[in-house]
Amino acid sequence: VIPYYQQFIQRFPTIFDLAKAPIDEVLHYWTGLGYYARARNLHKSAQYVVSNLNGEFPSCVSDLIELPGVGRSTAGAISAIAFKQKAAILDGNVKRVLSRFSATVGWPGKTIVTKKLWAVAEAYTPSERVADYTQAMMDLGATICTRSAPKCSVCPIMRECVAYKQNKVNDPASLVFNW
């Protein structure tokens, strides 16, 4: 993936370069980087930022959500990682970590469960080193607090994890863990 990313960045080093490029060229350089819908949204977002914001990328969650393809979690990740602003995230990996950590019961696609998980995410997101925390939470869910074979013995938050304390990490009757 890295060579494809480097090629993409070399061709479109600025938001202005990306905004003025034809979509077919953007898609060509996106080859090898994943979902093409992301490339289309990135292109539309670049055009929006150049046309409406004088090329200044927004930094706060409420403004980032206005960009095509950017939802609350992506906006939070951008705000936290790129701009070091306190902003919660709740991608699939983080949902799994926080649902186990807080023993939140229910399918995360349900509005009430999602609201609970957002509240947990917001409560635990620190004001300092927010970029490190955000990346760590995503990595924790991707590598340790995995869907089917969590590695609780090496988890840095194991001692505070309610599901671990209650021996319910993989209990389908009590927690959603298989997503």
Range-by-range predicted roles:
Residues V1-S153, I157-V169, L175:
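Catalytic cores of DNA base-excision repair glycosylases
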Residues N178-W179:
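Short Gly/Pro-enriched turn/cap motifs at secondary-structure boundaries
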